[in-house]
Amino acid sequence: MRFADVIGQDILKQRMRHGVQVGRIPHAQLILGSEGSGNMALALAYIQYILCSERSAEDSCGLCGSCKKVSALIHPDVHYTFPFPRKAGEMEQCSDVYPQWREAIKEDTYLNYEDWMQLLNAENKQGNIPTKELRNIIKNVSL
């Protein structure tokens, strides 16, 4: 996903580009917005811009190895965490449903929570991020 593919949000895209260009990328950022606002698309474009080895002042190249890996949602330096309905022995951490998540996000970066739960046949179960997944996050980001 490139910034050019993100609809609107021009001021925010410019701030993100500027931070990368001057070498001031916050160690953590929360990109939050209402459903359908395109924040997942914006986050993916930002990740790709940061990791691109051939970026221009305006956007990632979309062609280098890093861009291709980010676009395929398989870059080893990017970790995704998302809610899912826990099913004992089946789905106990995000990695158990990465293939479905990757396909769903590639198909629709504007995917909402209800549609995601429906794709996983959650029935009446709520999605959550279990303790085991939180421990994995801590392990992955520990220096």
What is each model feature region?
Residues 2-143:
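Clamp-loader machinery-focused feature within the broader ASCE/P-loop NTPase space
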